[in-house]
UniProtKB/Swiss-Prot annotation:
Entry's Gene Ontology cellular component terms: cytosol
The protein's name in its UniProt record: Isoleucine--tRNA ligase
Gene Ontology biological process: isoleucyl-tRNA aminoacylation
NCBIfam families attached to this UniProt entry: ileS
Recorded name of the encoding gene: ileS
Residues annotated for ATP binding in this entry: 598
Keyword list, A-Z: Aminoacyl-tRNA synthetase, ATP-binding, Cytoplasm, Ligase, Metal-binding, Nucleotide-binding, Protein biosynthesis, Zinc
Positions that bind L-isoleucyl-5'-AMP: 554
PANTHER family, per database record: ISOLEUCINE--TRNA LIGASE, MITOCHONDRIAL, SOLEUCYL-TRNA SYNTHETASE
Pfam families registered for this protein in UniProt: Anticodon_1, tRNA-synt_1, zf-FPG_IleRS
Oligomeric form and interacting partners: Monomer.
């Protein structure tokens, strides 16, 4: 007889190899055909809601790993919340306006000069919508579930209308104003930039020390003294109108070889070193406070213009001379202090960064090229004391990567100062995963200047502002709401298609326009105002959503971006934060922690991972990262992730194979009647479940990743499943011992599949489809396992046993190395108590020790002789097992017998086989 035929071997159609790149699209097609997104919502309708509001990615270009990290993290959260019974709709969004799309069209050969603004904008819209379709497909391929058939898009008429209404409400509260102020200006983009659009890179700049002669000493300083200023922007010297000193700093008049120079005393050594002064020839002649120097008048070094000495608290002794070159047209601090002294705002630079006619002899020069011309002129006038070059961190345009300047231009602003405290209070009432997140956004809002919301471009939402014939600004509740209504009906392109009078309410009149003529604003809104309006355009307008959102989750760069603009517009109009909880993630780096770049050849993109390995590998990788900081990815890291995936898959497959003949409705054993080892595993499952649920609640996916591996490797592979083979394959099909184990195995399989479902979405679904007798058609429509109290005494007892088992395994390994045994079933184990542990007493309550240790025979005695090896949990001796090997179960037995034609079988196998014959 072939005894193999009598074994109950695992059976399942669940394949060993994942084949994810081919399998996943098939699973996704099924989800789409069944409209699983809405099915999941319907299941939880009327339950408590959970709203994760999607920050809109920019609709341009292919997805990078940062996109994947972001969307997969969001999907973990929404899927988990759904399986916990929450009504958790997820509406993905896209940010669609702005310069990159204009530039992309130009690169494609679209000549905007050959068409009207409205026509060019239409092409921008077409391009953005094409990009959305491409990105949408890629997001869905990652297994992200959401309302992709009806996403929110910032160019949709209803969204633009909501944005205009926010603008109107802010204007109504006096928070929107126009002013000529220095703003970040990008000559390469020909537009103003918000702080969120600035990034810092190293730049080589001229460093100059310049002497300003005293023109009117006011009886304070010597008439022939000179103030020394230091700057790294020589091109701004033509705009100088003042020298700022700190009112409380001490200043000295130093005689250096007959020349008298005024600088801060705290910086005198640094200045002397920079200007190569011989210290022996330096003499401090007079001392003043900055307050005493106020209103002294200096002479501009090469223009017929005075430079007034003024006081400012922004002056520091970190660098320079303590006498700060002040040009209100080219610096925020300069502008603010200049306002107090009613100084003129001079900014002779055009949109391209070129000097205008107001720049005199520098007219036509690009500002950076003018640096040399200015220093040459200063040298000619004898005012340049030192020219050097330094490399320093300097603001750049985040899109073009070119340097930006401060330039005073007429711009529209949203007042931060008027709502700053309200925003800070709202931040205090917001929850954060980590305290540094709160500190980061709090400090950014606290230190933030006014928000420049105007842009000198065409692809964006127009500022709904009109001008009367006399130049008066028209921005009333009536006019703004009328524009919002027009945008809601026609879209914002109507602004560029109609005359101003046709955009105003019918019969509108204004005293500043006696002839009934009006003009409209040509600037558009900052794209951060677009996305920052999503709480109104999406949360408050979509019936399935609600305001405020439970959560915003984006990259850490959004503390100064979307998180910031959203809370600003929300607090300004609604008085509360648009999010209750804020979570951020880091950036994706290569395996060595370097930034990915084509030049380094270290770029990994989602499409590549999905096609080569599958979306579930990308998702498992996300769960393996400490995403709060920057994360790493490489081929080697993905290989390690694939190895972990393979272990998870094979473990699930083993369990599937061994419950193929089990029906939980008819074959389950009540918990009270389970074998103790099975009750131990059931309690370990409950412990693992509680920990996993807690980790999901706290967004700690790395803990889940590690604990899943630990549970699979330590509890299942190394013990329970290995121990179980002797029972599942060998014992009688309906025996109590086998059904007891299958009862627990089935529970582990079902619960683990559910717990893994938010992460391994496709694999969990595939496992579910092969699991017999499950009630729900999809694991994603099932509920998470409930957290059940564990039997702690049982767990403690079995943890001690598992430690003893580790000692036995160490002893077996030694015996194997000494050729006493080969496989563990060839072993006979004798265990005795020792000074460290009373093993003989402890083991009296355990049955079938030979099965638990996966050996043939176990003997427990009170004491062993000196030949025994002492371990932490007893003295252990390993010998070769007595008797002969059973041909069916491979255990050694002294009772192999011949019953009829059944030879070389142990008593257990004889009994099982006889029942089959």
């Amino acid at each position: 007889m072939d005894y193999k035929e009598t074994l109950l071997m695992p059976k399942t159609d669940f394949p060993m190899r994942g084949g994810l790149p081919n399998k996943e699209p098939q699973i996704q097609e099924k989800w789409d055909a069944e409209d699983q997104y809405h099915k999941a919502l319907e299941k939880n309708k009327g339950n408590e809601t959970f709203i994760l509001h999607d920050g809109p990615p920019y609709a341009n270009g292919n997805l990078h790993m940062g996109h994947a990290l972001n969307k997969i993290l969001k999907d973990f959260i929404v899927r988990y919340k759904t399986m916990q019974g929450f009504y958790a709709p997820y509406v993905p969004g896209w940010d669609t306006h702005g310069l990159p799309i204009e530039q992309a069209l130009t690169k494609k050969g679209v000549d905007r000069k050959k068409m009207s603004t409205a026509e060019f904008r239409e092409k921008c819209k077409e391009f953005a919508l094409e990009q959305i379709e491409l990105q949408k497909k890629d997001f869905r391929r990652l297994g992200v579930r959401g309302d992709f058939n009806d996403p929110y898009i910032t160019l949709k008429p209803e969204y633009e209308a909501a944005q205009i209404r926010i603008f109107g409400e802010m204007a109504d509260k006096g928070l929107i104003y126009k002013g000529k102020k220095p703003v970040y200006w990008s000559p390469s983009s020909e537009s103003s930039l918000a702080e969120a659009e600035i990034e810092y890179h190293d730049k080589r700049s001229a460093s100059i020390y310049v002497a300003f002669d005293v023109k009117d000493d006011k009886g304070v300083v010597d008439a022939d003294a000179k103030f020394i200023i230091w700057t790294t922007t020589p091109w701004t010297i033509p705009s100088n109108v003042a020298i700022t000193v700190h009112p409380e700093l001490k200043y000295g008049q130093y005689n250096v070889n007959g020349e008298k120079y005024i600088i801060a005393e705290a910086l005198s050594d640094a200045v002397a070193e920079a200007l190569d002064w011989d210290k022996a020839s330096i003499k401090l002649e007079k001392e003043y406070t900055g307050k005493e120097l106020e209103y002294v008048v200096a002479q501009h070094p090469f223009l017929d213009r005075e430079s007034l000495v003024i006081n400012g608290d922004h002056v520091t002794t970190d660098a320079g001379t303590g006498c700060v070159h002040t040009a209100p047209g080219h610096g925020e601090d300069d502008y603010i202090v200049g306002q107090k002294y009613e100084l003129p705002v001079i900014s002779p630079i055009d949109d391209k960064g070129v000097f205008t006619e107001e720049g005199g002899q520098f007219e036509g020069m690009f500002y950076d090229k003018a640096n040399k011309a200015v220093t040459d002129l200063l040298t000619e006038k004898g005012a340049l004391l030192k020219l050097d070059f330094i490399t320093h961190s300097y603001p750049h345009d985040w899109r073009t990567k070119k340097p930006v300047i401060f330039r005073a231009t007429p711009q529209w602003f949203a007042s931060i100062s008027k709502v700053r405290q309200d925003i800070l209070d709202a931040i205090e009432n917001t929850n954060f995963k980590v305290n540094w997140g709160k500190t980061r956004i709090y400090n950014m809002v606290r230190d933030r200047g006014e928000w420049v919301i105007s842009r000198q471009r065409v692809w964006g939402v127009p500022l709904p502002v009109f001008y009367a014939e006399n130049g008066e600004i028209i921005m009333t509740k009536e006019t703004v709401n009328h524009v919002a209504d027009l945008f809601a009906e026609h879209g914002s392109n109507i602004w560029f298609e109609r005359e101003a009078k046709d955009l105003l309410p019918e019969g509108f009149t204004h005293p500043g326009s006696p002839n009934g003529t009006f003009t409209k604003e040509t600037d558009i809104m900052d794209v951060w105002f677009d996305s920052g309006s999503s709480h109104r355009g999406v949360l408050e307008t979509r019936p399935e959503l609600s305001f405020p959102a439970d959560m915003y989750l984006e990259g850490s760069d959004q503390y100064r971006g979307w998180f910031n603009s959203s809370i600003t517009t929300s607090v300004a109009t609604r008085g509360v934060s648009p999010y209750k909880f804020l979570l951020s993630h880091g950036f994706v780096m290569d395996g060595e922690g370097k930034k990915m770049s084509k030049s380094l050849g270290n770029v990994i993109v989602p499409d590549q991972v999905v096609k080569q390995k599958g979306a579930d590998i990308a998702r498992l990788w996300v769960s393996s990262t400490d995403y709060l900081a920057d994360v790493r990815i490489s081929d080697e890291i993905l290989k390690q992730t694939s190895d972990v995936y393979r272990k998870i898959r094979n473990t699930l497959r083993f369990m599937l194979g061994n419950i193929n003949d089990f029906n939980p409705d008819t074959d389950s054993i009540p918990e009270s009647e389970l074998l103790e080892v099975d009750r131990y595993l059931l309690n370990r499952l409950r412990e693992f479940t509680a920990s996993t649920i807690n980790n999901y609640e706290n967004f700690d996916y790395l803990n889940i990743y590690q604990e899943v591996q630990n549970f699979i490797n330590v509890e299942l592979s190394n013990f329970y499943l290995d121990y179980g083979k002797d029972i599942l394959y060998i014992e009688q099909r309906d025996s109590h011992i086998r059904r007891s184990m299958q009862t627990v195995l089935y529970q582990i399989l079902v619960d683990m599949t559910k717990l893994l479902a938010p992460i391994l979405v496709h694999t969990a679904e595939e496992v579910w489809s092969h699991t017999p007798h499950v009630k729900e058609e999809s694991v994603h429509l099932a509920d998470m396992p409930k957290v059940v109290e564990v039997d702690q005494a049982l767990l403690d007892k079995w943890r001690t046993f598992m430690n003893l088992r580790d000692d036995v395994n160490r002893a077996l390994e030694t015996a194997r190395n000494e050729k006493v045994i080969g496989k563990s079933l060839e072993a006979k184990v004798t265990i005795a108590s020792n000074d460290k542990f009373n093993a003989s007493e402890f083991l009296t309550s355990f049955d079938a020790l030979h099965q638990l240790f996966i050996v043939s025979q176990v003997k427990v005695v009170d004491k062993l002789d000196d030949q025994a090896t002492a371990y932490e949990h007893g003295d252990i001796v390993i010998e070769h097992a007595d008797g002969e090997k059973c041909e069916r179960c491979w255990n050694y037995s002294e009772d192999l017998g011949a019953v009829d034609e059944l030879t070389h079988l142990c008593p257990r196998c004889q009994q099982v086989v006889k029942s089959l014959v």
